[in-house]
Amino acid sequence: PYRIKVLNTINFKKSMHYNPFAYLHSEKDILKLVTTLIANTKGEGKAGDDFWVKAETLLYCALIGYIHYEAPVEEQNFATLIEFINAMEVREDDEEFKNPVDLMFDALEAEKPNHFAVRQYKKYKLAAGKTAKSILISCGARLAVFDIAELREVTSYDELELDTLGDRKTALFLIMSDTDDSFNFLISMCYTQLFNLLCEKADDVYGGRLPVHVRCLIDECANIGQIPKLEKLVATIRSREISACLVLQAQSQLKAIYKDNADTIIGNMDTSIFLGGKEPTTLKELAAVLGKETIDTYNTGESRGRETSHSLNYQKLGKELMSQDELAVMDGGKCILQLRGVRPFLSDKYDITKHPNFKYTADASDKNTFDIEAFLSTRLKLKPNEVFDVYEVDTQGA
């Protein structure tokens, strides 16, 4: 049987809890989390202004580092990060003023002067009052979405157990809106942490390969935001029993997000399926990949004058196997499959209604629909500081 895990960013009432802070184990994990956050959210700095991004990175690393190493487990979440930023008052006319967060870092520096969070915070404090205020405004704008109480609650603790997906059969559903990208950064964070956690576990615990293959079916891949270093991940995860299937409406979507790395990502995919479409870039590249076929041409000619003459001409020419206009009007029941080491071939799409397990799906009958709210309501949820009794039962002596 499969374990069921669900992260639903459309309706948080139908979602389990996901806390990215629960998967921080080292300083590099903190940096990866900050990189993903910045890549998929918007601050107040001018687009392309590297200064604000680097300044925010320093502050986030300092605050998250403090929370990870010094705060109680129940306070290691985004809600605490928001409280830190809200408490960081800056007075432009008083450079000597210290806010509560400054005092906390001063106390930490006195105890642990080489602490990761202290070193990052001291670099941030090099900014003058007006600049520091601008950095805080940008951070506040980037994290404004966490003013929503539901989001703070769903990220307060973790139930997804991402690092265990390669240990036993698990079905993880990441549900996001296809019209609103406000919370898509959570999905991107989840994928980033999932890939990194599973790769590290495969190397450190299982000698290079996970015992249970993890297959990621990433539908609407372009809508989840950017997964940092995806071009490197797709090249290395396969050896660790992890595979990724990226589903796109057009290749241009991938290039819009990953720029020059889009070609590297596509090149590292062993299999690609064209289901149809009319986006020019996709059609042009596919037509080139399909190559050419040889055709025989037969020309006849007739010249009339005083005398009539006839001519015959046979010729072999190269023609695109399928031109762009032919690909654009390809039969909806057909697809083109490209496998590594095999020439592309035209195939029929599988009729899912003929699958022997189709009768178990919600498409076959509404009674098969999985009620996630009912599933979650039957699970015991422990809240921070909640008092409960623990009973030890010895079943061996019974």
Segments the model singles out, each with a brief description of its role:
Residues 234-336:
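Conserved ATP-driven motor cores of ASCE-family P-loop NTPases powering translocation/secretion/packaging/pilus
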Residues 1-242, 257, 262, 325-349, ...:
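P-loop NTPase motor domains
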